[in-house]
Every structure is written in structure tokens, then in C-alpha cells.
Amino acid sequence: MSKASYVKFEVPQDLADKVLEAVRKAKESGKIKKGTNETTKAVERGQAKLVVIAEDVQPEEIVAHLPLLCDEKKIPYVYVSSKKALGEACGLQVATASAAILEPGEAKDLVDEIVKRVNEIKGKTSS
């Protein structure tokens, strides 16, 4: 299956697992926003520390604006393979296309590591 058009880089599975763990920890000890509307607002306001986007969103237009907006606002973003897994990490009973970590809480070190690895991955793909 080919990647969606909004997926700008490949995320290794170990990193995707860390992303979901960071979302879980931030939900418990910090602050997150769930869903594309809330995530978009957090990015536009410059509040998001990390944006998480699911790769299996249909139609793609729901989240296609997020990578561009994040780049414009210089907010790091990362992908996870499943909107269902992202929804569960957010504490939801349903899937969610995207989420934003506003305050990482106990996940701060994990978020810092994720941002560093994402920047390394993006550096390789953009050169």
C-alpha cells in the first residue's frame, strides 16, 4: 500500500511506538489536544510542542494541511501508522486523525528525543 500524499517522511516503528507512549504520558501528566480541529488550532496559536498525525486517514484532505502548517509555524510533527492506535493513546474510545502535545509533563524527555530523531530523519530526506 502506498503512503498517503501528506506523509512526508518514513517513521521507524520503534519511533512510532515512542510517539504513542509520549502521547499517553502527556495525557496523564501534561496537556494534549485531540482531533484535527483542536490540533490545527493549537498549531495556529503556536501552543503545540509536537503534532502527531495518523497515516491512514481517509479522505487525506482532513489532515493534509497539518504538515505544511507545522513547517510554517516551525512545530515538529511525526506520523503514526494508525488513527485507532492514536485515539487509544489519547484515551479515546474512537480513532483520531491527529493530536497535539501542548504540555508534555512527564513525557518531556521522550518528546525531546522524538523531536531530535524526527529532525534527523527529515534532514536525510530533504537533502
Curated annotation (Swiss-Prot):
Quote the Gene3D superfamilies the UniProt record gives: 3.30.1330.30
Q: Give the record's keywords alphabetically.
A: Cytoplasm, Ribonucleoprotein, Ribosomal protein, RNA-binding, rRNA-binding, tRNA processing
* Subcellular location, principal: cytoplasm
Question: What cellular component terms from Gene Ontology apply here?
Answer: cytoplasm; ribonucleoprotein complex; ribosome
Question: Which top-level group of life is the source organism from?
Answer: Archaea
Cellular location(s): Cytoplasm
Q: Does the keyword Transit peptide apply?
A: no
InterPro entries to which the protein is assigned, alphabetical? eL8/uL1-like (IPR050257), Ribosomal_eL30-like_sf (IPR029064), Ribosomal_eL8-like_CS (IPR004037), Ribosomal_eL8/eL30/eS12/Gad45 (IPR004038), Ribosomal_eL8/Nhp2 (IPR018492), Ribosomal_eL8_arc (IPR022481)
Which residue positions does the secretion signal occupy?
Answer: none
Q: Which GO terms describe its biological process?
A: ribosome biogenesis; translation; tRNA 5'-leader removal
Q: Which PANTHER family match?
A: RIBOSOMAL PROTEIN L7AE FAMILY MEMBER
Q: What does this protein do?
A: Multifunctional RNA-binding protein that recognizes the K-turn motif in ribosomal RNA, the RNA component of RNase P, box H/ACA, box C/D and box C'/D' sRNAs.
Record family assignment? Belongs to the eukaryotic ribosomal protein eL8 family.
Subunit info?
A: Part of the 50S ribosomal subunit. Probably part of the RNase P complex.
* Protein name (record): Large ribosomal subunit protein eL8
Give the organism the record lists: Saccharolobus islandicus (strain L.S.2.15 / Lassen #1) (Sulfolobus islandicus)
State the organism's lineage: Archaea, Thermoproteota, Thermoprotei, Sulfolobales, Sulfolobaceae
| Name of encoding gene | rpl7ae
